[in-house]
Every structure is written in structure tokens, then in C-alpha cells.
Curated annotation (Swiss-Prot):
One Pfam family linked to the record: LTP_2
Organism: Pinus radiata
Extent of the signal sequence: 1-25
Protein name: Male-cone protein 1
Organism domain of life: Eukaryota
Length: 92
């Protein structure tokens, strides 16, 4: 009888771990949309433009890992389009 009880405990523990992992997983699917108010501060013609309060609020509400994932996604676009890789040396 000990084996079924142990199996049930293991299954319950596994289910709890799955739930915790799902809760901790970040949803970064709309990170780029959230940061739309920042476009005027990061565009090519944004030399010295101060970010708006909306941009700063959006940035506060977006995790660093989501921002980084978004940047990596943009940088990976040329390869997905069969274009040369981005080289950003000498730029900020």
C-alpha cells in the first residue's frame, strides 16, 4: 500500500511544481506594445529627446528580461529574413 500513496504524493508534488513554474513564467508577448510611448526617445531623430513620463512609466512596468528579450528579437530579424547580421559598432 505504501507505493500508491508515494505515487500520489509524487504526482501532487509534480503538479504543484508545474503550477509554480507557470505562475513564475513571464509573458513578454506585449513588451514592445507597452514600450510604444518610448519611440520618440529612441528613434533615429531622437538626439537628446528626453523620454516622456508615459515612456518612463511603461519602462517601470516592463521587466528587464522582457526588454532584453525584445531587443534580442529585433536583432535576430535580419537572419530570419536572410539578410546580413546587424553590426552596431560605433552607435549608442
Amino acid at each position: 500500500m505504501a507505493a500508491p500513496r508515494s505515487s500520489a504524493k509524487s504526482a501532487a508534488l509534480f503538479a504543484i511544481l508545474l503550477i509554480v513554474a507557470a505562475v513564475q513564467a513571464e509573458d513578454c508577448s506585449n513588451a514592445m506594445d507597452k514600450l510604444a510611448p518610448c519611440t520618440s526617445a529612441v528613434g533615429l531623430s531622437s538626439n537628446g529627446v528626453k523620454p516622456s513620463s508615459e515612456c518612463c512609466d511603461a519602462l517601470k512596468g516592463t521587466s528587464t528580461s522582457c526588454v532584453c528579450k525584445s531587443v534580442r528579437a529585433v536583432i535576430s530579424l535580419p537572419a530570419k529574413c536572410n539578410l546580413p547580421a546587424l553590426t552596431c559598432s560605433g552607435s549608442r
